[in-house]
């Protein structure tokens, strides 16, 4: 009868166990690296939004936002904490909070998400300046590449 001896199997099993224990941290680092690429590009896109102090009308819409609205977008943009959901792990990038322009309708300031959406899609008094969709689309490949590099680097640290 033939005999076979396998050496190093215990080491491989230990590496795989270490990998499974550290998987959430590897996923977190990978997701944040990819989101960071998109977020950096989005910050540049926000800086590129034209400013306009005029008040738009349907007959004469503005093409841009007020400087204080732009400042609110710049300051409120960020990445959410990682969440584990049914279909996997997610991080989101977006706008939060309110800018400093207080109105009768918004005494606490205008919602930054509302301003970003109105710039992206346009309104009856503002022409669209689609910066979000364009930035996400152009950043996708670089973000995926960075995520793959980070993942491989983290796995290679464990699987020596």
Where are these regions (language model features)?
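Generic secondary-structure boundary/loop-capping signal
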Residues: 1-3, 16, 65, 74, ...
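Short amphipathic alpha-helical segments with heptad-repeat character
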Residues: 17, 21-32, 133, 137, ...
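Short, low-complexity, charged/polar segments at coil/turn and helix-coil boundaries
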Residues: 21-122, 159-160
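Lipid-handling modules and contact-site tethers
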Residues: 113-160
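N-terminal, Lys/Arg- and Ser/Thr-rich interaction peptides
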Residues: 1-25
């Amino acid at each position: 009868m033939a005999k076979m001896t396998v050496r190093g199997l215990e080491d491989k099993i230990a590496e795989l166990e270490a990998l499974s224990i550290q998987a959430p941290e590897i996923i977190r680092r990978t997701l944040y690296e990819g989101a960071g690429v998109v977020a950096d590009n989005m910050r540049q896109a926000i800086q590129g939004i034209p400013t306009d102090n005029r008040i738009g009308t349907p007959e004469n819409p503005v093409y841009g936002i007020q400087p204080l609205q732009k400042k609110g977008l710049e300051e409120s943009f960020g990445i959410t904490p990682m969440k584990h959901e049914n279909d996997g792990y997610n991080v989101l990038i977006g706008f939060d909070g309110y800018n400093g322009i207080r109105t009768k309708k918004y005494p606490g300031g205008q919602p930054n998400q509302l301003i970003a959406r109105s710039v992206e899609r346009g309104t009856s008094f503002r022409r669209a300046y689609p910066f979000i969709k364009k930035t996400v689309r152009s950043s996708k490949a670089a973000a995926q590449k960075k995520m793959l590099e980070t993942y491989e680097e983290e796995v290679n640290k464990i699987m020596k």
